[in-house]
Design a protein with these regions (language model features):
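Small-residue helix/turn framework positions
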Residues: 3-46, 51-72, 77-79, 89-314
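Gram-negative outer-membrane assembly/targeting C-terminal domains
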Residues: 308, 312-326
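Short, compositionally biased segments
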Residues: 85-86
Length: 326
């Protein structure tokens, strides 16, 4: 066994290489107080893990303060085994890939496996427990989009590349979102990217309908919930529900994560009353979808149609185009 103590601007801590012991393979054991990986160093880290798999059989890594590409991402814990998986393909089996922040905790596992001679793909099963959506987005580079908001985002997602480099064009998966007690804040067009579409202030700004008393300061919500499917960088939903104290919206459609465009159907409920409250009693089954759900509601509760307005939202995230559907 050898041990190395490290103290530098980029990292501080210790590393050990532990030899095999019975059924326990050799292990790289790392404990760091901090680790800073600037953008220029990310390819080097990925190259090390890709080109030297047999010499690093297992990883046990804890970093108390991780900074990746200039973003402070809190505590990182990795437990990974390099092995030959199914179909005789060598992979990093990620038994633990956890990130802990004051605003949220990511708990994940999965693998990073070769798809071909030069391509490796990350696959993660994850739960993101969110304590403050607004502060989390601020940390990740989107300030002033949301205030508060607690809940969960969980599912499965995969992409070409390493666990530390998201590649939207190859991303696929599915996830469920459930956030409560927050507020989409009033922002300039494009400042919050796709979140700007969910902030219903975009509707009165672009249309003659006067919803300004409801949405002028941003949309305060009791909950935002729904399912999202991602296929090669395009996200789809057919059951997204947003409910506020006096108003709400139902959304289905798609958003291109690479081109930053969308094509959405938005049904606005400017007043939640005895007629429209039924729209939010139950979660919309993704097998049914918003269109069928609304059709059933209109048949059973005719007041629902009278209490809603429908819009098409397309164009770019920075400049969405909103059209009322008569």
């Amino acid at each position: 066994m050898w041990r190395l103590n490290i103290s530098a601007d980029e990292l501080n801590g210790s590393a050990e290489v532990r030899p095999p012991n019975g059924n326990v393979p050799a292990q790289l054991y790392v404990r760091l107080a901090y680790l800073n990986i600037p953008p220029s160093s990310v390819p080097d880290v990925e190259r090390l893990l890709t080109e030297q798999p047999s010499s690093i059989p297992t990883l046990d890594i804890v970093v108390n303060e991780l900074t990746l590409r200039g973003k402070k991402l809190g505590r990182l814990e990795i437990d990974a085994v390099n092995r030959v998986g199914t179909n005789a393909v060598r992979e990093w089996r990620l038994n633990k890939f956890n990130v802990t922040l004051p605003e949220a905790t990511l708990t994940a596992n999965g693998n990073w496996a070769a798809e071909g001679p030069r391509v490796r793909r990350t696959q993660l099963n994850f739960v993101l427990a969110i304590r403050d959506s607004g502060d989390l987005l601020t940390r990740l580079g989107t300030p002033g989009a949301i205030r508060y908001g607690e809940g969960r985002l969980e599912g499965q997602v995969s992409w070409q590349g390493s666990p530390i480099t998201l590649h939207y064009a190859s991303m696929s998966g599915k996830m469920n979102l459930a956030i409560e007690k927050g507020q989409f804040l009033k922002t300039e067009p494009g400042a919050a990217r796709l979140l700007g579409v969910l902030n219903l202030q975009a509707l009165p700004r672009r249309l003659t309908l006067d919803f300004s008393d409801l949405f002028s300061d941003g949309f305060a919500f009791d909950f935002v919930r729904g399912d999202v499917r991602i296929d090669q960088g395009v996200a789809f939903t057919n059951n997204l529900q947003m409910k506020g104290v006096v108003a709400g919206a139902l959304i289905e459609g798609s958003a291109d994560l690479v081109r930053e465009t969308q094509k959405l159907k938005v049904v606005v409920v400017p007043e939640i009353n005895a007629g429209t409250a039924a729209l939010y009693v139950a979660t919309i089954n993704p097998l049914i979808g918003l269109t069928s759900y609304l059709a059933q509601m209109v048949l059973s509760k005719p007041l629902v149609r009278a209490g809603t307005s429908e819009f098409q939202v397309d164009g770019t995230w920075a400049d969405p185009r909103v059209t009322k559907v008569d």
